[in-house]
Amino acid sequence: MNIVVTGATSFLGAALCKELVSRGHQVYAVVRPGSSNRQVLEKLENDSHFHMIFRNLEELDQLDREISVECPVYFHFGWDGSGSENRKNPKVQGKNVLDGMKALEGARKLGCKRFLFSGSQAEYGICADTMGETRECHPVSEYGKAKIAFGGKATEKVRQWNQTGVCRMEYVHTRIFSVYGPGDHPWSLVNTCVDHFLQGEEMEFGACTQLWNFLYIEDLVKGLCALAFCERAVGAGTDPEESGIYNLAGEAD
């Protein structure tokens, strides 16, 4: 199957590309021109199943100029300011929503049947108990607000397309919780702890009053693939004919 992955050099995107290639799919990995993270994909560059496309996020509606085949599955992971101070920047996060809608339009042009977006647990806001897909969202960060805003706009656009016969597409909104594993930022909590412990050093923590959910990167990728290739991606809290919301997280006790 022909599959598009934006944000392909990210922690999640790179792992997904590797898994899809290993399964024999033709992967079109969208990378920003001059990306400093391109090296995370270097082991795939000589594989006949892997194709690197250089485009900025605001150009994602133009991928049909470089990809000449239909791509039934499209993963949109491209997002500015995911792990930086720009998570708080409304201008940066607002542009992500606009760029995401361009990605959706670009996917339509490529004959996409299932569009999968990397949402976040940040959409729920501050919660003291289990976060289920039907829980009302009260995002606090600009990052979380933008993720949920894009989900609403994309769901409505796909509904319009399906109702008017423009195309038939499913929009799948994944809410990804904390992920760890090879390729994660060296300053992440898990990596920092492991580095300290391996060197016999102590690690300073706060009061440790929060219960937090972590999922291994390989398990996340398997979950994403399950959503991409299942017969029908029906989720909770949305129109089952068109969309689905899925939490991707570790098992909850």
Predicted regions and their residues:
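NAD(P)H-binding glycine-rich loop region in Rossmannoid oxidoreductase-like domains
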Residues: 54-95
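Active-site Tyr-X1-5-Lys
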Residues: 140-172, 198
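Alpha-helical substrate-binding/gating segment
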Residues: 191-203, 214-246
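Flexible, glycine-rich beta-alpha linker
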Residues: 124-125, 141-142, 172-189
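N-terminal Rossmann NAD(P)H-binding glycine-rich loop of SDR-like oxidoreductase domains
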Residues: 3-23
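Short-chain dehydrogenase/reductase
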Residues: 93, 140-151, 187-188, 213-214
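Conserved Rossmann-fold NAD(P)-dependent oxidoreductase catalytic core, especially the SDR/UDP-sugar
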Residues: 74-76, 80, 101-142
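Glycine-rich Rossmann NAD(P)(H)-binding loop
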Residues: 6, 178-183, 204-212, 236-253
